[in-house]
């Protein structure tokens, strides 16, 4: 599903009057999640899931086919843990 199709789905599910309203709702939601995660906070929507950050350790490696090595730094990355209800809905959709 692409963004335009998702906007249509949100418009119907949320009973918005226009695609613009649905797109604004999606933008507000994503901005709120981005803001919370950038502050190190988590966002938990009971039944749907939890957005949080995790520390990803740096690693060392070797470039295949050469003797060059590289090292990456530690960084914070976003994570999503699906909730029980979401898992059940996905399972039912099989």
Curated annotation (Swiss-Prot):
Top-level taxonomic group = Bacteria
GO molecular function annotations of the record: DNA binding; structural constituent of chromatin
Q: Which InterPro entries match?
A: Hist_DNA-bd, IHF-like_DNA-bd_dom_sf
Keyword check for DNA-binding: yes
Instruction: Work out whether the entry's keyword set contains Cytoplasm.
Output: no
Q: Where is the composition biased (Basic and acidic residues)?
A: 68-77
Q: Where is the composition biased (Basic residues)?
A: 78-87
**Region Disordered: start and end of each range?**
56-94
Q: Name one GO cellular component term.
A: cytosol
Q: Which GO terms describe its biological process?
A: chromosome condensation
What keywords is this UniProt entry annotated with? DNA condensation, DNA-binding
Q: Family per UniProt?
A: Belongs to the bacterial histone-like protein family.
The role this protein plays is: Histone-like DNA-binding protein which is capable of wrapping DNA to stabilize it, and thus to prevent its denaturation under extreme environmental conditions.
Subunit structure, as described in the record: Homodimer.
Please give the name of this protein.
DNA-binding protein HU
- Supply the source organism for this entry: Helicobacter pylori (strain ATCC 700392 / 26695) (Campylobacter pylori)
């Amino acid at each position: 599903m692409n963004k335009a199709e998702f906007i249509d789905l949100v418009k119907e599910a949320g009973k918005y009057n226009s695609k613009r309203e649905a797109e604004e709702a999606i933008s507000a939601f994503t901005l709120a999640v981005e803001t919370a995660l950038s502050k190190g906070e988590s966002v938990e929507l009971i039944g749907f899931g939890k957005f949080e950050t995790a520390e990803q350790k740096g690693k060392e490696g070797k470039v295949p086919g050469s003797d060059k090595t590289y090292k990456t730094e530690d960084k914070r990355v976003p994570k999503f843990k699906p909730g029980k209800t979401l898992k059940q809905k996905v399972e039912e959709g099989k």
